[in-house]
Design a protein with these regions (language model features):
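Short, cysteine-centered beta-strand-loop-beta hairpins and adjacent loop/turn segments enriched
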Residues: 70-74, 102-113
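Generic short beta-strand segments
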Residues: 42-45, 98-105
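A mature extracytoplasmic/lumenal domain signature
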Residues: 40, 50, 99-100, 135-138
Length: 185
């Protein structure tokens, strides 16, 4: 049996990696957190695009709940279509890396593609293949989130400047109006 409820049990490393990859992508895109974490090692370390580090399947579940599924999620929708750039297989363990081609819609309606880079380490523990570590990152100096933040900052700066300008105009108008009319200051 290549796949059980407990995870991927295919003895051939390359076939097992392909099966595990398919399970992870499908469960992620379908928001099936139970299935996703069932493919993680009990000691898994996951580093997300925002720099947050999760330890163990429960840490991943907690992150998912807070960011995606909870009462006030940051992310409304997401999808990923990862492409492996390369992979090194060393018998019972392997390292893969590539591009996630990940797309997001935030709760405020902002949509963007990150094209996060990833590195994943998987290993066979007994008969079952599990993810040992996963790291996703984005270019800190050039990514769509920076543009969203800059746009929001510019919008709010403009609104605040307009309010201050209106208040200053009203105050200055009253002061100058009093001077012209000869009213005491």
């Amino acid at each position: 049996m290549a796949q059980t409820k407990q995870g991927v049990t295919e003895p051939d490393a390359l076939k097992a990696i392909a099966l595990l990859r398919g399970e992870l992508i499908d469960s992620f895109n379908k928001r099936d957190i139970d299935r996703l974490v069932s493919n993680l090692d009990p000691d898994v370390i996951v580093t997300w695009q925002n720099g947050e580090v999760c330890r163990g399947p429960q840490g991943v579940r907690d992150y998912y709940q807070r960011m995606i599924a909870g009462p006030d999620p940051v992310v409304k929708t997401f999808s990923s279509d990862p492409v492996v750039a390369d992979r090194h297989v060393y018998g019972d363990w392997a390292v893969s890396w590539g591009n996630l081609h990940d797309q997001y819609e935030l709760k405020d309606g902002e949509k963007f593609t990150l094209n996060s880079l990833f590195t994943a380490t998987i290993a066979r523990r007994g008969d079952v293949w599990k993810v040992e570590s996963f790291h996703a990152s984005v270019n800190a100096f050039d990514n769509p989130i920076l543009g969203i933040v800059a746009k929001k900052a510019a919008t709010w700066s403009g609104i605040i400047a307009a309010i201050i300008g209106v208040i200053a105009g009203v105050v200055l108008g009253r002061i100058l109006g009093r001077r012209k009319s000869g009213a005491p200051q």
